Amino acid sequence: MIYSLKHLNKYLPEIKLDQSVTKALESLGFEVEFFEKFSSSKGLLFAKVLNVFDNPNSTKLQVVELDTKLGELTIQTTNKVLSKGDLTICYPVGSSYQGKEFQEVTMQGYKSQGMLASFSEIGYDNSLLTDKDQILVLPKNFASLNDDASEKLELNDYIFELSITTNRNEINSYYFLAKELAAYYNTKFSCEFLDAKLKQSFESSFKFEGNFLDKNYSFTLLEAKGKVSTSFEEKLLLAKHKIDSKFNPAVNLTNLVLINLGIPIHVYDKAKLKSTKFSVGLYNGKVNLLGNKQVEVSDALAVFNGDKVVSLAATMGLEESKVDLQTSEFIFEMASFPSKLIRNNAKEIKMNSNASNLASKTITKYQVKLAHKFLFNYLKDLKLSNVVNDFELDKKVEINFDEEKLQRYSNGLPSSEFIKAFDKLKLLEFEFENQKIKVPLYRYDVSIFEDIIEELFRFYNYDNFKEIPYIQIPGELKADNKNFKEKLKALGYSEARTFTLVNEKDSKFDPLDLSDAIKLETFVSKEREFVRNSLAISLAEAVNNNKKKKINNVNLFEVGMVNANLFYACLATTDKSFLELKQDFVSFFDNLNLEFKKPKNQFLHPNYSAEIYLNDQKLGWIGKINPSFLDLDCLFVEFKYDLYFDDKFKKYEAPNLDVLKSIDLTFELNNNEHLQKYLDKINSVAKVFEIKEIDDFKKETSHNVSLRITAPSAEIDKLNSHFNKD
């Protein structure tokens, strides 16, 4: 989700957030995808129109005389929308936008001291705010001329995106992210709607029927009569989220709930509903989605009014029941549905909406209750009904405290060491009493004490743990592990540590031909559910993370466990060529008769990879991942770790001091024939130092490949007598 730093800061009134918040977010376990200024606008001013007249020397230009805090200015424009007394915005001489500095110019006999601006010329997408891209005319009481335009229009904002794990879906909202930061900074969390109460004016005639949803889900309605309004600032916030605000303000309200609380809600035009009965169930047939897009769905979770479908649950509304600019009586639906069925809805209509993106993961009943309060506060000046089909929240889940387990995971630290972390968790609605821990109702992912430990460690900060020497003894190996790593570091590789567990998709990556991935019975999240079949898929994730941080030249290595308790080593590089990577690998095993064969494994790039064999036993692979599985411009070599340590491979041979010679051999290959059998033949005849391809002459049905073989004189004689017979 994308966030506005200024709006997030409104929940934390006693501190000022800045770019350093990225460190806090990453410390809390949230990966920052990007963090950037919202607008490049500099020096923008509010301006009052003093006079407007057409340039007598031009049929297109209009001269606008303005009053600003810098004094009076004259600016010419072709966009003739301003009148005397209007409040607008302008770039004076010396200000800039997108790196362009504005200068004073003379046009058709009149000076122009800057530029008047529209939404699109200060950083916003005008199509989300207005029907026409024209000079901005503001309400006359919106600002004074002395106000900071960048502050008032929230241009001096930062926009950032977080990558959220599937088990923390609630963080896709300002409310819950702000709570995390309030605990992290130990500062006040402020929320104007949190104490809102329902001011009921009438009893709704609508009812919810049916038992399709079990007790883990909810479906509630709130009826409202009157005019809903959206503030200018709220429209700007929605625009930052790429959300159109040119609809009935009631629709804008549903989107404000979406981004603030992370829960999709829906609104219906009461006048278009033919029944007082609502229900939920599966639907098969055609529906007319918002935007007049007709689709046919199968087993889609739908909301019914009587026997008529009025929306696809938490996915998209329908044209027949939508609110328009004339609607004055509204039915707001606030609900939580089975996420699996919402994912099916998105699949059926072949698109993901903002609503389905959130509801395809768990939405808690606690969030539904928060949505009630948000509406109670926002609609307090309207006539409101009772909440139809309201419910009581369940009791908090209780987990037994386990001191011994905490010390085991923290390397002997007592619970007293985590006092500050306990206090921070209390700010997040965790309760600690009588060796029991009560879990907040929105934390559906916390169910065992190990989850509590993870929360404690997050707020204790992993940097506070003292580093302990890491000793890894793979199996029965007792050779010099440190020497192996030092050699790789000398070759320019940095050691990486990745998770042994991966998600279901990545677990299918099996270039080593091991076996079906092992699925854990209990797991922290869907991202860490299976034991990996390859180190390369984990290093690929590390490479991608580096690329997101604009680190494009990466050389990594890892030694670790894969499926079946096997230890492998893997090198990953975006900086070296295939031959350079191969040479780095071969440099460890100079005395081995390794073979590089065309890959048969479906996960390897067929034209840019090879499988590594020794005595007909597959030891690993080198090259790229098949782009049909993962499109990543990165080379890998992955091999059995014990290959480096096995003494039978450590044979010493006295160096041959003879001067090396070379011979050129040419072989004719059919167009679909591989070169490997000729390489095998050369290696069986003589012990060569190097083989290089120097030419490849194409013919209609075949091609001639010329190889240059370098070897000691005696070996060259063997090749000459074998291949160059009269």
UniProtKB/Swiss-Prot annotation:
Keywords: Aminoacyl-tRNA synthetase, ATP-binding, Cytoplasm, Ligase, Magnesium, Metal-binding, Nucleotide-binding, Protein biosynthesis, RNA-binding, tRNA-binding
Cofactor, free-text remark: Binds 2 magnesium ions per tetramer.
Domain of life: Bacteria
Class in the EC hierarchy, top level: ligase
Subcellular location: Cytoplasm
Gene Ontology molecular function: any one: tRNA binding
Record carries keyword Cell inner membrane: no
Coiled coil: none
EC number(s) recorded for this UniProt protein: 6.1.1.20
Residue ranges of every copy of the B5 domain listed in the record: 394-467
Disulfide pattern: none
Catalytic activity: tRNA(Phe) + L-phenylalanine + ATP = L-phenylalanyl-tRNA(Phe) + AMP + diphosphate + H(+)
Binding site for Mg(2+): 445, 451, 454-455
tRNA-binding domain location: 38-150
Record InterPro entries: aa-tRNA-synth_II/BPL/LPL, B3/B4_tRNA-bd, DNA-bd_dom_put_sf, NA-bd_OB-fold, Phe-tRNA-ligase_IIc_bsu, Phe-tRNA-ligase_IIc_bsu_bact, Phe-tRNA_synthase-like_B3/B4, PheRS_beta_core
GO cellular component, one term: phenylalanine-tRNA ligase complex
Cofactor requirements of the protein: Mg(2+)
Family assignment from sequence similarity: Belongs to the phenylalanyl-tRNA synthetase beta subunit family. Type 1 subfamily.
HAMAP family: Phe_tRNA_synth_beta1
Descriptive protein name: Phenylalanine--tRNA ligase beta subunit
Gene: pheT
